[in-house]
Design a protein with these regions (language model features):
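Feature for secretory/organellar precursors and membrane-associated catalytic proteins
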Residues: 146
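Glycine-centered, small-residue-biased loops immediately flanking beta-strands
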Residues: 143
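A short alpha-helical cap/connector motif
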Residues: 1-140, 150-193
Length: 193
């Protein structure tokens, strides 16, 4: 039913920005099987279809963005282990920092001090909109934020998208993706993922 409600948002239909269209078409909704999908599916057989689909998206995003650091906030150990493997499959040289649900504030310091491209991976049920807004403000041009499990806490996403300027955001139902760039006009795309 979710897929049908977003049928008009398939494969980048209606997106005028060449950059955003390319990201949707070749990163978010890429259907070509990447080199590590099969191995990772064997390594994590307990992952359901949605978590496997999300993991494959993480691999493609890391492959595209080549972040120097990923900061994961609010996940349990099992989720972090699986997500770390998918992100690392896309960018083997990245540094990984995992922060539990109760320790979200140190992530803000980590994001503000580290050089290079960052990717913040946040669990929507474990954070609030105020914290996420502050985290995005500390990021630099070219950084990404993945708000995972968005379907469990839509209010956080809606509040962040409403508050922030100079972002391009993609609502993919299961997760949200924010790209930080002060030179771009604010855009929010709904994607059939």
């Amino acid at each position: 039913m979710i897929w049908l409600s977003r049928i008009g948002c398939c494969r980048g239909f209606g997106i005028q920005s060449p950059w955003a269209y390319s990201l949707v078409r070749y990163v978010i909704n890429e259907h070509y099987p990447y080199y590590a999908y099969e191995r990772l599916a064997k390594d994590f057989p307990e992952a359901d279809a949605v978590r496997r689909k999300m993991g494959e998206f993480f691999l493609r995003l890391a492959n595209h963005a080549q972040p120097e650091m990923v900061v994961a906030v609010g996940f349990d150990d099992e989720d972090m282990k699986r997500d770390k493997a998918y992100f690392r499959a896309g960018c083997n040289s990245l540094r990984w920092t995992g922060i539990g649900p109760c320790d979200a504030d140190p992530a803000l310091e980590t994001l503000g001090n580290a050089p290079g491209t960052h990717l913040l991976h946040a669990n929507a049920p474990a954070i609030d909109a105020e914290w996420l807004t502050e985290a995005v403000k500390r990021l630099r041009t070219g950084d990404f934020v993945v708000v995972d499990r968005l379907n469990y806490n839509k209010a956080v996403w809606q509040d962040v998208v409403r508050r922030l300027q100079n972002i391009v955001s993609f609502d993919m139902y299961y997760c949200g993706l924010v790209y930080v760039d002060p030179k771009r006009y604010k855009q929010n795309y709904k994607i059939n993922f």
